[in-house]
């Protein structure tokens, strides 16, 4: 009787391996979906980091004190070098002009 009860609770190594693989696969999908959702909610996050880095760099401070045409102008209160800051209904504001 005890051998029947013990055999019911034993699991084959294949089933354990499949459960671990499934868990790791689902974990990867969850992390990837969080990344994609974050990128969708905050588009251009990498551009912002590059812009902040350039603004702090003393060599580029004069060159990057204003936004060039077609660059974003609504971040960090950056003014346009030439032209004006245009904000469409959807999307980021950008510098427009010569």
Curated annotation (Swiss-Prot):
Q: Signal among the record's keywords?
A: yes
Main subcellular location of this protein, as a coarse class? secreted
Cellular compartment(s): Secreted
Q: Which residues form the propeptide?
A: 41-64
Keywords (A to Z) from UniProt: Disulfide bond, Ion channel impairing toxin, Knottin, Potassium channel impairing toxin, Secreted, Signal, Toxin, Voltage-gated potassium channel impairing toxin
**Expression sites by tissue:** Expressed by the venom gland.
Signal peptide region: 1-40
- GO CC aspect terms: extracellular region
S-S bridge residues? 66-81, 73-85, 80-95
Q: Name one GO molecular function term.
A: potassium channel regulator activity
- What is the stated purpose of this protein? Inhibits with low potency Kv1.2/KCNA2 and Kv1.3/KCNA3 voltage-gated potassium channels.
* Family from the record: Belongs to the hainantoxin family. 17 subfamily.
For domains, the record's comment is:
The presence of a 'disulfide through disulfide knot' structurally defines this protein as a knottin.
Question: Per its record, how is this protein called by name?
Answer: Hainantoxin-XVII.3
What is the species listed in this Swiss-Prot or TrEMBL entry?
Cyriopagopus hainanus
